[in-house]
Amino acid sequence: MDTPVILFGAFDRHNFGDMLFPHVAAAMLPDREPIFAGLAERDLRAEGGHRVEALSAVAAWLGERPATLIHVGGEILSCDAWQAAVMLAPPGEAQRLVARLDARPHEQREWAARMLGTDARAPYATAARAAFRGPLRIAYLAVGGVELDACDEALRAEVLAALAAADDVSVRDRRTQAQLQAAGIAARLAPDRQ
């Protein structure tokens, strides 16, 4: 039995650009049938996306079996839990949440942790390792973090630790690559023809 491959990213929301990433990543794995996972379960097939499983459900289903998880594209390195949770909320609710909690960072973090089921500060970039009980190979494919240097120190430290522990890292822009290199993390530029 092949080790399951999980494509994980911010394609669990209605954003056309983010919904393209798993199509490209799946095409790079022609002999595999990847599992598409996000922070939330969504069925975006009607919009050209995928049926996306919640990461926590995929981890529970796999139990202690080994897996490979590929973080797929997007500006996930600097996307904090509050931003991720608001993006996953229904549009009307998102506007009310922002109005109510905009100047309350502590309450934002508490609400986001409840909504997402994780305390990760940058959940699209760092929640995977803690979710799985079995051996997990982790790769980052063409991820971005142009604003990582502007994020708070705790988020930056969490992201850099996750990247340092990864089996492979590629980024989508030179600025992110330079920031990671300055932190001692080697990251290839993908696509590599830029």
Give residue ranges: language-model regions.
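Helix N-cap/beta->alpha junction signal
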Residues: 18, 173-174
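Class I S-adenosyl-L-methionine
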Residues: 26-30, 174-181
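A short beta-strand/loop micro-motif in the catalytic core of glycosyltransferases
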Residues: 167-171
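Helix-loop-beta element that forms the nucleotide-linked donor phosphate-binding surface
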Residues: 177-194
